[in-house]
UniProtKB/Swiss-Prot annotation:
Function: Insecticidal, cytolytic and antimicrobial peptide. Forms voltage-dependent, ion-permeable channels in membranes. At high concentration causes cell membrane lysis.
Annotated family: Belongs to the cationic peptide 06 (cytoinsectotoxin) family.
Keyword presence, Secreted: yes
Species the sequence originates in: Lachesana tarabaevi (Spider)
Molecular function per GO: toxin activity
Propeptide segment residues: 21-60
InterPro entries named in the record: Latarcin_precursor (IPR018802)
Keyword flag Membrane: no
GO CC field: extracellular region
Domain of life per record: Eukaryota
UniProt name for this protein: M-zodatoxin-Lt8k
Subcellular location(s) of the protein: Secreted
Keywords attached to this entry: Antibiotic, Antimicrobial, Cytolysis, Hemolysis, Secreted, Signal, Toxin
Tissue: Expressed by the venom gland.
Length: 129
C-alpha cells in the first residue's frame, strides 16, 4: 500500500512538470531583444535569465516523454484496479465491471480508485487509534 501511494505521488509530480507552461525559445528571446533595444542592465539580466530557461525546456521534454510512459502504465493499472474493486465491492461479474469501467473517463477511473484506497487507508488509521 505504501509503495502504491508513493507511486501515485510520483505520478502527480510528473503531471505537474509535464503540464507546466513551456519556456520561451531562444528565437523568441532574440525577437524580444531586437524589439525592445535593451538599454537597461536589468533588462539584460532578465533576458539572460530567460535564455537559461531553454535548458529547462529540454529537461521538460525528457520528463514529458517519461511522464507519458508512466501515465500510460498508471492508467492501465488503475483500469485493472477499478475492475477488481467493482467486482469485489458490488458483487458483479468481471465482464459487467469491465463494461462499467469502459464507460467511465480516465479521470473518473482515477478518482474512483483513489477514493477507494483513501477510504481504506483512513479505516486502517482509525483502527490503530
Amino acid at each position: 500500500m505504501k509503495y502504491f501511494v508513493v507511486a501515485l505521488a510520483l505520478v502527480a509530480a510528473f503531471a505537474c512538470i509535464a503540464e507546466s507552461k513551456p519556456a520561451e525559445s531562444e528565437h523568441e528571446l532574440a525577437e524580444v531583444e531586437e524589439e525592445n533595444e535593451l538599454a537597461d542592465l536589468e533588462d539584460a539580466v532578465w533576458l539572460e535569465h530567460l535564455a537559461d530557461l531553454s535548458d529547462l525546456e529540454e529537461a521538460r521534454g525528457f520528463f514529458g516523454n517519461t511522464w507519458k510512459k508512466i501515465k500510460g502504465k498508471a492508467d492501465k493499472i488503475m483500469l485493472k484496479k477499478a475492475v477488481k474493486i467493482m467486482v469485489k465491492k458490488e458483487g458483479i461479474s468481471k465482464e459487467e465491471a469491465q463494461a462499467k469501467v469502459d464507460a467511465m473517463s480516465k479521470k473518473q477511473i482515477r478518482l474512483y480508485v483513489l477514493k477507494h484506497y483513501g477510504k481504506k487507508a483512513l479505516q486502517k488509521v482509525s483502527e490503530k487509534l
